[in-house]
A protein has these predicted regions:
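Short, well-ordered amphipathic alpha-helical segments that serve as non-catalytic structural scaffolds
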Residues: 12-15, 57-65
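C-terminal binding/interaction regions
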Residues: 1-22, 68-118
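Short beta-strand scaffold segments in enzyme catalytic cores
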Residues: 26-35
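Compact, glycine-rich, soluble single-domain proteins
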Residues: 45-59
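Short acidic-glycine loop/turn motifs at beta-strand connectors
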Residues: 35-37, 109
Length: 118
């Protein structure tokens, strides 16, 4: 991916993060999923008082895309206010693997990022 495309996806994930519902952890996460056709779906984490029912930003973006008929993906960016780039949790990694998303862009609000390929 080109640098400008990576940055665009990170920027969209930052916008998504602003919509987070995280009254319990106060830890907002945003994600942006780039589909093969160029469409981008955003997602944020949505918490619940019953923590097990919380949905992560990555899964929110993926589920939105799949519910709209998308099945081919190019990359997923995830952003949080962390010291280093933010990595997906185990549940999100499982869903990322299931849908064969080839590139994960892990970023933070400081401008740091790492791209990993599956």
């Amino acid at each position: 991916m080109k640098e400008k495309d990576i940055q665009k996806l990170i920027d969209r994930a930052i916008v998504a993060r602003d919509k987070t519902y995280s009254p319990y952890s106060h830890f907002g996460v945003g994600a942006a999923l780039l589909c093969e056709d160029g469409t981008i779906y955003e997602g944020c984490n949505i918490e619940n008082a019953s923590y097990g029912l919380t949905n992560c930003a990555e899964r929110t973006a993926i589920f939105k895309a799949v519910s709209e008929g998308q099945t081919k993906f190019k990359a997923l960016a995830v952003v949080a206010d962390t010291e280093g780039p933010c990595a997906p949790c185990g549940a999100c990694r499982q869903v990322i693997s299931e849908f064969e998303i080839p590139r994960i862009i892990m970023a933070n609000l400081r401008g740091d990022y790492t791209v990993v390929e599956l």
